[in-house]
Amino acid sequence: MSEAVQKDAPFWLTGNFAPTFTEHTETTLKVTGHIPPELNGRYMRNGANPETGESVHWFAGNGMIHGIELANGKANWYRNRYVRSPILKDSGADGTEDPRTQSLANTHIISHAGKILALEESHWPYELSPELETIGAYNYNGKLETGMTAHPKVCPETGELLFFAYGMVPPYLTYHRASATGELIQSEVIDVKGATMVHLSLIHI
């Protein structure tokens, strides 16, 4: 499905990294080997897929979700869909949207409290249907006033979603906590002297 778009393009625009320009739904899938019948569910991945075929940086393409559904030893479907934020050309945006909706939504995808969310580092997440269709920007019923990191963590004991947001203007850093049922229950500004990029990693010791 991918194709090289420029002869001397950077690696993220060529070969296996090259963007695909078509949204597919395939229900006749060839399986090589054997899918365990107890392996049921949907696997989804998110990544940058610039709709123009050009991108100045690996992280700057529009978000595209790829997904496959497995059930009873079969692969029922594969599909890929753009995350339809106002950044996408055919989104119907008219320029009056809240700036926090201006997300590429191209970095990560999570499932929490019955919601499937496509994430990036600076804006609100985007909620998707189980079939990968875009539902819209998600802000916890208006309670999330900042953006949301692309790398939240789920507490293994409480099921709460822990995340933060950082920005170029105050508040520079805000910590958030959502309950296991998906309610935003805590937002705390963390006092820092200025804007800084914060990137969370999980380290096992």
Whereabouts are the PLM-identified features?
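Short, charged/polar micro-motifs that form catalytic or ligand-binding hotspots
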Residues: 55, 115, 191
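N-terminal regions that are enriched for targeting/export leaders
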Residues: 2-64, 68-74, 80-81, 86-95
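Well-ordered mid-protein domain cores that form the structural environment of catalytic cofactors
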Residues: 83-186
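Conserved small/polar residues in nucleotide/adenosyl-binding loops
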Residues: 203-205
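Short coil/turn segments at the loop-to-beta-strand junctions that recur within blades
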Residues: 141-145, 191-196
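Internal, well-ordered alpha/beta segment that forms a basic, Gly-enriched binding/recognition surface
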Residues: 199-200
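Amphipathic repeat-derived elements
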Residues: 28-52, 163-192
